[in-house]
Amino acid sequence: MRSDIAPGGTFPDYALPDHTGTVRTLSELQGRDPMILTLARGHYCPKEHQQHLELAAFQPKIAVAYTQVVTISTDDHHTLQEFRASVGANWTFLSDPERIVQRDLGIQEYTDPDHDPMIPHTLVLAPGLMVHRVYNGYWFWGRPTTGELWRDLRDVTSQIRPDWDLAAPGLRAAWDAGDHSLFHGWDRRPDND
């Protein structure tokens, strides 16, 4: 992995086709929320299958916490669709059969010349694609548990949401004064001018 892809760095804003064939950027998919990004070997790998099954089971909690999930795989379009369906994922999968991400990040898994995959990584990104945490998943035990992801996402969310602690000084006064700009969701309502 490139040395700049570390906590505090910015992850590249790749533009790749999703499982429907639509080209999407990571920043578009992330919006202003935290994001879990998996860089996957592909559908053929049982370790990927297991990790993504666990993420799919965790996904309802991820969704209610205003967090995004994206998987980038070297699979072609059809195989990518099968991968996504086989694990019951309802988040965006991006296809990179040209291995743009693999080459740019320097994560070719050279021990598998048959498939030429990426070394698997899971990243937790703060808004703006800012790297909070990087997990190297070449070995399965290097991949994060849902408990570790929960802790990482708690850290990121507490840093980016001014209304994380409603008892914080000034929040109640701002709310009572009609200033909802510090309150997630309320800050985007049309009546918050």
Where in this protein do the model-derived segments appear?
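Chalcogenol-based redox active-site neighborhoods
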Residues: M1-D193
